[in-house]
Amino acid sequence: MGKENLYVWEMTPGMVHENDAAERLLALCGQENMLRSETKEGKIELTAACDGLFRVDSQRLIAVNSREDVMIATRKGNTAVRKGDKLAGMRVIPLIIKEETLQAAEQAAGAGPLLELLPYVKKTAAIVATGSEVKKGLIQDTFTPVVKEKLAAYGIETISIAYSGDGVENVANAIGEARKTGADLILCTGGMSVDPDDNTPGGIQASGARIVTYGAPVLPGAMFLLGYFEDGTPICGLPGCVMYAGATIFDLALPRIAAGVELTRRDFAVMGEGGLCLGCKPCHWPNCPFGK
């Protein structure tokens, strides 16, 4: 072992061994849809048991990690993970820790798990491709295939594609027909800019959706729109950058939407920090700072 001395630890009242302490830290994290490792050298790790959205209660995690002699490290929250991905690791710093110190960490954690892994629940989507030039066949629809591929990565099947043309009424009517398909998610492509004939935002509003945000502090993707219908069905207006950029606001929002999380305006506001794509060549998304 390379050691001149061997040490024997004897149980002392009021002290907790690192292995037992790690189990208690694990209990704070939660394990639904996650798999734990064996306790090794005082450390336990969590991995994903399914594809889904990994979420972290950041403020409570900070509260725990602010206590003395304990640590829980996680991957970034609100990110998509695959089955088998590493999610978190936890341990205490010393070999043995005071019971009162461990209890202080438990109290700081409060009620409920610090971590959660939400499986994707949205299974079907309907796409409304706007623009008269697409409807008339003057240009090829290169937007829809990109969106379908992004949806498929989260297990979402595209069950309907409609070409609305221009005009608020035309877009609204096409959205109404898309809703009749029973799709879990509706996506409108194009027509999201400031030109007079960009009527997609108006069409979405006219369709009866409650608009959460039109615009987001993310580049590329500033002209993104998200709304919800009364039954909870989300609808997105996708700007043209989704068609050609490696990663956009849609890639940040889609995992949450697919997991059934209802986003708020504040959710988008906090995306501003880290919301600037650096345009790296080649693109390394999602292994990059964008959206982190």
PLM regions: where:
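Glycine-rich phosphate/diphosphate-binding loop of Rossmann-like nucleotide-binding domains
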Residues: 111-166, 170
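Short, compositionally biased
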Residues: 25, 99-115
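Short glycine/threonine-rich loop/turn motifs
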Residues: 132, 159-291
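Solvent-exposed alpha-helices and their adjacent loops that cap or buttress functional pockets
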Residues: 36-39, 79-81, 116-121, 179-180, ...
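Phosphate-interaction motifs
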Residues: 1-100
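Structural motif
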Residues: 4-7, 34-36, 43-45, 85-88, ...
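Glycine-rich, charged/polar anion/phosphate-binding loops
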Residues: 30-32, 72-75, 108-115, 174
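Generic secondary-structure signature for well-ordered alpha-helical cores
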Residues: 3-4, 27-34, 51, 83-86, ...
